[in-house]
Amino acid sequence: MEQREQPAVQVPSLDGVTRERFLRDVYPRREPVVLKGMELGPCTTKWTVDYLSQAAGSKEVKIHVSAVPQMDFLSKNFVYRTLPFDVFVRRAAEVKHKDYFLSEDEKYYLRSVGEDVRKDIADIRKQFPVLAEDVQIPEYFEKEQFFSSVFRISSAGLQLWTHYDVMDNFLIQVTGRKRVVLYSPRDVPYLYLSGTKSEVLDVDNPDFEKYPLFAKAKRYQCYLEAGDVLFIPAMWFHNVISEEFGVALNVFWKHLPAECYDKSDTYGNKDPTAASRAIQILDRALKTLEELPEEYRDFYARRMVLRIQEKAYRNDNG
């Protein structure tokens, strides 16, 4: 298996960014930035394992459990289990477990959801109201743009696969340390997508024989310490490793007008409705091309690609 180390571009960090400066200088650039020195409330010092266990109590939560650190959405190398929150958070903070589902060194991951996952969004104020009182969310967007606030807890070493979201978001690292690797939306041709996720699971040691184009993807990287906030614009791919047991909060908001999004989307990962319709139309067009012999199909497919490039690609060199 051919492997090559990819150089990384460090995501820039800014200290003490106000709402006004963010909206004027940062947000229009549509690039990731680490925001330091943000006022987040007492959560960064208060959220110990003992406090979390006591504050959220025995509320049952559905969690991911994996016998290996690198979670794989292709082979589904994890299972879903339900635990009382206080039991879960203590297990997630452990390295070796006396009680376990798969193995004594299994990893745990919580991604909070709404009461009815088909209809309700994740909102820390509703699912974990006591904890929500400890958090001051940077409201660098209008209230009507707010979509969800997702509470996350990860075991040390857990790695989530590379994916994109269709909403802008702040990844607020409350406790612990994370490494985040990101890829620009413009590198989508090199990421071997399956839906919203990249099939290149190991971004540190990719199999270039299987995924040769991945070598062309420009890697951006940052490390988040407790109290850091990472701005991830919509459609930027991100891969996250929890280097320590940690607690985080994702705050998603709508960059586009509300009517552009799928109203049935409770996770923030369904493509905008116009994009979904366009992809369906393209699929029908490709089906129509199958009526032609291969030589003609190839010719007209290339013309279609040129038409898309001329009409839909941005014409700058960014």
From Swiss-Prot:
GO MF term list: iron ion binding; protein homodimerization activity; tRNA binding; tRNA(Phe) (7-(3-amino-3-carboxypropyl)wyosine37-C2)-hydroxylase activity
Top-level taxon: Eukaryota
Cofactor(s) needed: Fe(2+)
Binding sites annotated in the UniProt record for Fe cation: 163, 165, 238
Pfam families: Cupin_8
EC number(s) stated in the UniProt entry for this protein: 1.14.11.42
The keyword tRNA processing is annotated on this UniProt entry: yes
PROSITE patterns documented for this protein: JMJC (PS51184)
Binding-site positions, 2-oxoglutarate: 109, 169, 178
Keywords of this entry: Dioxygenase, Iron, Metal-binding, Oxidoreductase, tRNA processing
GO annotation, biological process: wybutosine biosynthetic process
Catalysed reactions, semicolon-separated: 7-[(3S)-3-amino-3-carboxypropyl]wyosine(37) in tRNA(Phe) + 2-oxoglutarate + O2 = 7-(2-hydroxy-3-amino-3-carboxypropyl)wyosine(37) in tRNA(Phe) + succinate + CO2
Subunit structure, interactors included: Homodimer.
Function (record text): tRNA hydroxylase that acts as a component of the wybutosine biosynthesis pathway. Wybutosine is a hyper modified guanosine with a tricyclic base found at the 3'-position adjacent to the anticodon of eukaryotic phenylalanine tRNA. Catalyzes the hydroxylation of 7-(a-amino-a-carboxypropyl)wyosine (yW-72) into undermodified hydroxywybutosine (OHyW*). OHyW* being further transformed into hydroxywybutosine (OHyW) by LCMT2/TYW4. OHyW is a derivative of wybutosine found in higher eukaryotes.
Family: Belongs to the TYW5 family.
PANTHER family: HYPOXIA-INDUCIBLE FACTOR 1 ALPHA INHIBITOR-RELATED (PTHR12461), TRNA WYBUTOSINE-SYNTHESIZING PROTEIN 5 (PTHR12461:SF104)
Identification of the protein by name: tRNA wybutosine-synthesizing protein 5
